[in-house]
């Protein structure tokens, strides 16, 4: 009989577990500490629980931590890990080390419904949403976990399309009984879904990054079908109702395509669209994917685009590209094993 995973449980849920097993009330906090702070590899290591209570716990539960089943290493130090989340489902997480920080790009779904033209994950179609356990396992089972400084929800899937489980995972990441991370260390990236965006802003203090890619609705809808359901102009109007001037950061992601969205008219329209918002723009280099007739703009074009926006008061950066040689860069998260499973 399958056992229930403890990883991904809130303190309230752990209190229900200990109550049902006849354990003392304080045992829930002890279990949470072992799970999220002390990084145990088995229930037997929870030594401040009595042997009897450990045996009771083991009878119905396990840690719910599963090591990656495969990995690929880039020449730039980036590592892509493959996690098996069920018999036929796989997701990837990408570890990105830098001089003074180490970031993990985490997945929220197997595949994605959004079908953005430039994204390999969307070409897979949608298979399943991850549980909080499966989201947090990408962190808990990471070999470099102790080096992590930041987490970005920018992997496979649309986080706002799996908001209950994503919010639960973020709560555990930031709760004092959980990992105890500052929300400033976590960024969620989204195409922007009407039903989820407002709830995320109001229930989480983590940074928010919106996939923009064109300031013109008709063109954005060609690149990102989600535009047809919730336009970027409506989204900006909603975002203006919230204060992003303090510790929380609002960013807009902008992949620069050669001859598509890289001219001065686009920069001017971006300034017009985002006027009045306390935000920044991250320019991203496009990496070619099979069957997509888009090409990345050159660095000179991207630099000019950045300088124009910044000189007109919109702080803009060019994001460093990492892991291209192992298909780990933005829009390239697509697993051969998942595609193989979908065919079977």
Curated annotation (Swiss-Prot):
Keywords associated with the record? 4Fe-4S, Cytoplasm, Disulfide bond, Iron, Iron-sulfur, Metal-binding, Methyltransferase, rRNA processing, S-adenosyl-L-methionine, Transferase, tRNA processing
Residues that, per the record, bind [4Fe-4S] cluster? 112, 116, 119
Name the cofactor(s) required for activity, per the record: [4Fe-4S] cluster
Q: EC number(s) for this protein?
A: 2.1.1.192
Q: Which reaction does it catalyse?
A: adenosine(2503) in 23S rRNA + 2 reduced [2Fe-2S]-[ferredoxin] + 2 S-adenosyl-L-methionine = 2-methyladenosine(2503) in 23S rRNA + 5'-deoxyadenosine + L-methionine + 2 oxidized [2Fe-2S]-[ferredoxin] + S-adenosyl-L-homocysteine; adenosine(37) in tRNA + 2 reduced [2Fe-2S]-[ferredoxin] + 2 S-adenosyl-L-methionine = 2-methyladenosine(37) in tRNA + 5'-deoxyadenosine + L-methionine + 2 oxidized [2Fe-2S]-[ferredoxin] + S-adenosyl-L-homocysteine
Give a yes or no for keyword Ribosomal protein in this entry.
no
Q: Name one GO cellular component term.
A: cytoplasm
Transmembrane segments in this chain: where? none
Its localization reads: Cytoplasm
Q: In UniProt terms, what function does this protein have?
A: Specifically methylates position 2 of adenine 2503 in 23S rRNA and position 2 of adenine 37 in tRNAs.
Q: What else is known?
A: Reaction proceeds by a ping-pong mechanism involving intermediate methylation of a conserved cysteine residue.
Q: What is this protein called?
A: Probable dual-specificity RNA methyltransferase RlmN
Q: Which organism is it from?
A: Bacteroides fragilis (strain ATCC 25285 / DSM 2151 / CCUG 4856 / JCM 11019 / LMG 10263 / NCTC 9343 / Onslow / VPI 2553 / EN-2)
